[in-house]
Amino acid sequence: MSMKFLTGLQDLLGLYETGTAASSPASPIPPTSPSMFATPPHQQSHSSATSVRKKVCQEANSSADDPDSDARIRQCSHTRTVSFPADIGLITGYHDAPSALFHSIENSNRSIDPTEILKYYREACQRRQCAPSVGVEKQIGYFHKSPDTRQELLSLKGERVSHAQMEALEEIFKRVQFNTIDFEYTFLDDDCAISLGEMIEFYDSCVRLNLSFNKQIDVRGWAAMFKSIRNAISLQMLNLRYTNLNDRSIPSLCKLARAQPSASLTCIHLENTQMSGKNLLVLICALKYNTGIRELYLGDNGLQPTDGSHIYQLISSNTCLQLLDLRNNNIGDSGVRHICEGLRNRESIEKSALSAMVLWNNNVTGASMDSLAEALMENTKIETLNIGSNNLGVEGVARLKPALVSNSHLHRLGLQNTGINCEGAIILAECIADNTALLRVDIRDNPIALAGLLALHSAMKMNTSITLLNIDATCVRMSSEKVREYQDEFERYFREIQTYCDRNKDDVLKKLTVTFEDQDHVSEDTEKENKDADNDDKEPENEDGDTTPETSDSDASADQSDSPADKEKSEKSKKENNNNEKRPLMASASTSKVCQKERHQRFVRSSSLTCAETVHDIHDRLREMSGSTHSLDAAMSAATTLSPTMLTATYGSTPGPLDASSNTDSMKTIKKTFTVTSAAPPTLALAEWGSLPALPQASPTSTPVVRKLRRFSVSPSSSVFDVATTSSASTSPIPEVTASPHPIRPSTLAIGIPVTGSVPAGPSSAPMIFVDHHTEAASPDCTNTCEEPTTSREAERKRAEETIRQRRGQKEIKDTCRAVINDLLNYVEYEEKSQVERKASLLLRNAFSRPNPEELLKNLQRAESPLTPRTPVTPSRVLEIAEELEEETDEQVCQSVVRCLVRDVLQTEKNELRSTLDRRRRHNSVRNSPV
């Protein structure tokens, strides 16, 4: 090493001994041969660069064999130079990076041939030794021929797709693009997921991808899939319902959410993916600053009240999320309060874009509605709110009333199955009467009777904005025979509600028509001015300020198609492309205007407020998916012992039968759940229809929520007046007229003289009363079934029970009379009286004085008669009045007398209602007047 260093230093400084340099000859370069540079066979390279280098070395070595090379080298070796041939001689060829056919220029010149695609698909299946899918072959035959328009759907739902079949589908993906690719319930594994992700990324195959009900995809498959989705430029919707997202695969999803710039993904479904607790917190931390996702579905994940704080962080931090779906969880009142705090946060009020929220079936009560009302009054961006399937009751509607009265931005309100009765319907009617923002209200599956229907009917007369009011048709059904003549009248009220909705809808459409006509005239004028001025192809602007690039192209195509030759060409192209439903190349100005009108009219089409499950065979799917239904099978074995017509829907409580008519509503809702006892092993979770994996075991401190599998989607649906036919409450059979201690349900709204020996059958919401009079004890020989008390102790016990029953009956009579009077007030207040009824009431007012209700109660208690059921709405004086008034029927006279009893109270309530409405109108006029 030192010798080499010294030699190099000597060469650098040029220190040579003259005598030595002149006398001592330098060592000659030893002759070399090609064998010296030869490499072993296993190290030989066949590249062109290596062969060139060998050739240069051989030429240099051959020169050393010449006689001149024996001369002494008297200079430093650093003066040598090495040269290489030109670079262009080293490059023998090149190959472009592969690209999909859809990104090339030749794509617009080609046409789609379904026969050719089918041939290539079958050949690919034959090479991979797998059977082609019959459904795929049938769908290929319906492909249209336009290369610039995506096909609508490619569905393999319910088929078992292997890795070989997935690879064979590439022959389709490389030639055709789709709007939706559906791999729901196809038993995909990691290899299938990796191949599918690569094809979606490379070919940009779809806009919406459905991978739900695939439990066999694990960490490796999800990592590759999420990486491909991050690079997909057109994918907008991803459905991952009932998939196996665990702690190891969620970080890959979080990388997708944190990607900057954000991916094209705007909607993601994560129902029943164990997204609660720590997993939810990790996901929300990734979504805080995401600017792409607009819709997030987190239903059926067993969210607890403590998860409400995580939702608070999402609402207060994210600025682009528009829809948050939290259906079928156990958030509770405390969790709702956390969410309301997020809605009231200053940053969310200023920057948040959240406009729709779903809290369906979250064990929420009326106690948290005051917080929700305050949040709605402060946050003016919420347009859709669904709080159905929660036990809100009248208290919840009353607490929500301030927000509904003063709210001017809430468009859709879902109150389905919230325990609203007639009183709650009257409160809601007061809110609807003056509200000008609501477009749809859903109050189905609530025990609303005739009084609530009349209140809603009166409110809809005044309302000018609601285009769809969902209410059960059972509210007009009356079980009593004596009021059967009023059935047609109440059905007319029910139909008029639909008429009022159609009236409001027509008014909105007329306004839209006028707006579009004005806009069309303005756009035509601007086009003429632009053409006359400088022949500029500048598009007119629409109402929203967005330009319509289709206008100039469509006008040009319309002008070019005026000649006969162009018409013939267009007809030929139509015949050739008869399978093409969408033809953007042949669009005209009229079609662009129609599309523009449809886009603007979407706000008329209200969103669906019914959380109905659309998967009818969900149980079979859960049972087939391996490793996911161990507890569900146990639940099914326990449920099969029950009657086929009796389904239970409770957790930890006594199971009760579901109404058989509950499955006959218009949305085909599946209301099926199972009862799992708390004695199950700790390793098995609770199983139910609507969630998998199921909720954790119930603890003494927290009670799991009862969940009916009813799904919610705010996707646009038809605005036709939809009236469900489900019965809100099952009516109990009326007992026979016997001297039994069971209570009798009166007909509170059945006004008429009852037939002797009959009991009016009232609605199930009416209270139970006793008409019990003090009579002598029955004789011992009255019936053979009665047994005499054998001991004095039994006799004393029976007497004590009889005394308690009598006291209880007297109290129930008083409460029932008050309830009857309240029902009569509501009935008479909203009823349109005929001339005959008014005439009878005037005659009775002049002839008789109004009796005191307290005296009627006392007389009813003092009267001694056999134990016979009566209705308190039929006083004994009605018979005398009916005999004196020969011109009127007995039923009309009875109705008039009852109305006379409550006329003073009615007048007071009408005055109060009139003053309240006048005050509100004055307040609105002052508020709306210009300052």
Curated annotation (Swiss-Prot):
Official protein name in the record: Protein phosphatase 1 regulatory subunit 37 homolog
Organism encoding this protein: Caenorhabditis briggsae
Bias kind Acidic residues: ranges: 534-547
Biased composition (Low complexity): 554-563
Region Disordered, annotated ranges: 20-71, 519-602, 780-807
Stated family: Belongs to the PPP1R37 family.
Gene3D superfamilies associated with the record: Ribonuclease Inhibitor (3.80.10.10)
Residue ranges, compositional bias (Polar residues): 41-51
Positions of LRR repeats: 232-259, 262-285, 290-314, 323-346, 351-374, 379-407, 409-430, 435-458
UniProt biased composition (Basic and acidic residues): 519-533, 564-584, 790-807
InterPro entries according to UniProt: Leu-rich_rpt, LRR_dom_sf, PP1-Reg/Actin-Interact_Protein
Organismal lineage: Eukaryota, Metazoa, Ecdysozoa, Nematoda, Chromadorea
Record key words, sorted: Leucine-rich repeat, Repeat
The keyword Repeat is annotated on this UniProt entry: yes
UniProt keyword annotation of Oxidoreductase present: no
